[in-house]
Amino acid sequence: MVMRKLLGGSSFDRYCFGMLLAVEVLISFTFLGYIHFPPISITIAYMPIIIAACLFGTAPAVITGIAFGLGSMYKASATYVLPMDMIFSPFNSCEPLASLFLSVGTRTLLGLFVGLAFSAVRKSAHFRSWLCLLSVLAIRLHVFLVYGAMGVLFPQFGRNYTIAFRLDYLDILSAVVCIFLVAGSWELYNSQKVQQIKLYIDRSSITSFIENSLQHRALGFFAVALTLTIVAAAYFTQRTIYMLQQQGIKIDSDIAGDLLHLQLQFVMAIIALNVILTLLVVCVYRYLAYKEYLGAMDSLTGVMGRKLFLHNCEELQNKQVLLGNKGKGWFLFFDVDSFKNINDNHGHLVGDQVLRDFAGRLNEALSAYGIVGRLGGDEFAAMLYELLDKKALIDILDELYRQLDEILL
């Protein structure tokens, strides 16, 4: 998966970036990209790019920039927008490549440059100060890139890069809002509570096999839902046109196209909201699943308790059957020799330590091949689902017995 390569092994980071990307789509396709209190209007559509660069790095910031650019290009493709806005659309301007660079290319470069800048200072002892400075500079960089490209590609509009060096009270207010959002996101992400949630989600007990299966099904469902949503948008556009015509309003091809354009814009906003909600539900599910998993662990030894172990044995057997291994593997029982004598002669504290060490050695030796659990008292079991031959198993067990003898001695 592309997301896994970009964000490493953290499921939590992938979910957070997915939500941030959906927020970018939402505000790029709606009025939410602007905070408007007449006569003040502040754009915040670029802020998810800066937050992505701050939290996740260069590649996620570039992807977010592309999403911003595509949203800008789509909105500029309607026939009712202002002439200056039309140059952001390859379909409305006379220079399609220039418009593509102006709308998508400049926002992609913004993500690249801001991502590289945050990556360069991430390990700095004064990162918070750099965060504030880069947040402000990112705003000016966005203005510089967009108006600089406009000055070169569309000079007839009289706008150029010098606008980036002009400051008024709106620019100062935008900088304050940007610092507040970026710094707030950074502090929230690195707070103790959120980091604990991240740890739980990343360690959740959903196996990669099950997770991949669910992801493939989810992608298939999403593709079907997206197709049906677009069909529904086209249908409602047609019905809207019919209703207006019945009222005596003449609808030409441009108006019909704009109605469909607005319907699809609405669809994108709804999809973005649903993605955010879905990812939040997944995060809550995996967090609670891991809390339940911890509750089923053996508190003394740190390995699975009896109930959880037997449940996982059944799940793993079913998985092996699905993978075509016909449930083959090894099921091993272990107990501590003369454990009652250890407790009687040395006390329960020593006995507990022996159990902890015993379970630790079992887990260390066998967890790469299967799962380990405590059945009760001094009895343990392991289910090995890797296809080991008898000789390989004997070699592993010989080394394990040698380590276990060291504990008991």
What is each residue range found by the language model?
Residues 235-238, 243-299, 307-318:
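Signal-transducing coiled-coil linker helices
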Residues 2-27, 74, 78-151, 182-187:
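Short helix-perturbing small/polar motifs within transmembrane alpha-helices
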Residues 2-63, 137-158, 186-188, 197-262:
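Hydrophobic transmembrane alpha-helices
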Residues 383-385:
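Short hydrophobic/aromatic beta-strand micro-patches
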Residues 298-301, 332-335, 377:
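Conserved metal-coordinating catalytic motifs of nucleotidyl cyclase and c-di-GMP turnover enzymes
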Residues 89-98, 158-172, 210-211, 250-268:
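Membrane-interface segments at the starts/ends of alpha-helical transmembrane spans
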Residues 293, 305-317, 321-330, 340-367, ...:
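Conserved long alpha-helical elements within nucleotide-processing catalytic cores of c-di-GMP signaling
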